[in-house]
Amino acid sequence: MSLFDWFANRQKTEPKVQQQQEREIADGLWTKCPNCGVLAYTKDLLANQLVCLDCGHHNRVESEERIRQLVDANTWNCLDEQIRPTDPLKFRDRKSYSDRLRETQEKTGLTDAVRTGTGTIDGLPLALGVMDFRFMGGSMGSVVGEKLCRLTEQATDESLPLVIICASGGARMQEGMLSLMQMAKISGALNRHREAKLLYIPVLTNPTTGGVTASFAMLGDIIIAEPKATIGFAGKRVIEQTLREKLPEGFQTSEYLLKHGFVDAIVPRTHLKKTLAQLISLHQPFFPLLSPLNSHHHYGQPELIPLKTAQGQTTV
C-alpha cells in the first residue's frame, strides 16, 4: 500500500468526532499571513498588534482592537453610540438596505462603520475616531458623518487634538447624496477645529479610498499612513480605462504618496501610539525645554516656553 493510500484510508476510517475536535482545537489558534503565507500563533500576532512577525504585513484591525492598542487603559469614553442609520431612500439592490444594515450590525456588533470617543494616549487627552472596514467596507454614510462631525465639534469645544483612523471604501452608495453631503459636513467641522489652532492627525490605513480620501483623510495638519496601505480615490482599473494610459506600479500605496508629498510620514503600527503621543505633546500650548549636557542632550527640569500667537501676543 502506498503512503498516499494509507493516509486516504485513515482519513476515511477516522472517527468524525475526533476530526471535529481537532478542527475545534485548531480554529483561531493559528493565523496565516495573506502576504507571505507564514502561519503565526494568533496570541503572538495580537501581541505584535496584528503585524506579521515574518514579513511585517499589517493585517486589518477591528475598531475595538485599535482602540485598545492606542488608548490608555480605563480612559476610553465612547460617544454617540445611540445614533443608528436609517433607510430614507428605501434603497434596494439584491436586498434592501435595511436588511443589509441589520445583518451587518448582528455580525459585527457595531451600529455603523465608525467608533468615536475621548481618552488619553500616554497621559495626553485626545478625541479619537476609528473606522471599521468590517461594516459595509467602512463606507461613509450619514451616521459616520454625524458621529465624526460631533466628535470634531467636541474636540473644538474642549480644545482637544483630534485623531481619525481611516479605513474605508468611500461614500456609501445606498445613501446617495446623503452620503456625499458628509464630505462637506465633516470638512466644515475640521475647518473650525483648525481655526481654533488645534491639531488634527488622520492615520491612513489599508484601504483608504473614495470620498473619505477626497475629504477628511487628506485635511490633516500631519498626515500619517501605515506601511503599504492602499490610498486613492478611484480604483486603478477605472482610472486606466478613463485616461487610457498605463499607471505606474504601486502608485496608490502609502510609499508612493510619501515620495510625492501627499503624506508626511509612514509609521509602523507598533510605533503608532508613541508617535502620536510625541506629536500631540509637541503641539501642546507648552512643552518642556531640554537643556544641553556635554553639548548634546540633557533631560533637565522642564521649563515653559513662551509662544507667540498669530496676533503677536505672547503666551506661556
From Swiss-Prot:
Domain CoA carboxyltransferase N-terminal: 29-298
Zinc finger (C4-type): 33-55
Domain of life: Bacteria
Keyword Cytoplasm among UniProt keywords: yes
Binding site for Zn(2+): 33, 36, 52, 55
GO molecular function: acetyl-CoA carboxylase activity; ATP binding; carboxyl- or carbamoyltransferase activity; zinc ion binding
First-level EC class: transferase
GO-annotated biological processes: fatty acid biosynthetic process; malonyl-CoA biosynthetic process
Keyword annotations of the record: ATP-binding, Cytoplasm, Fatty acid biosynthesis, Fatty acid metabolism, Lipid biosynthesis, Lipid metabolism, Metal-binding, Nucleotide-binding, Transferase, Zinc, Zinc-finger
Pathway where this protein functions: Lipid metabolism; malonyl-CoA biosynthesis; malonyl-CoA from acetyl-CoA: step 1/1
Pfam families to which the protein is assigned, alphabetical: Carboxyl_trans, Zn_ribbon_ACC
Subunit structure: Acetyl-CoA carboxylase is a heterohexamer composed of biotin carboxyl carrier protein (AccB), biotin carboxylase (AccC) and two subunits each of ACCase subunit alpha (AccA) and ACCase subunit beta (AccD).
UniProt protein name: Acetyl-coenzyme A carboxylase carboxyl transferase subunit beta
Encoding gene, per UniProt annotation: accD
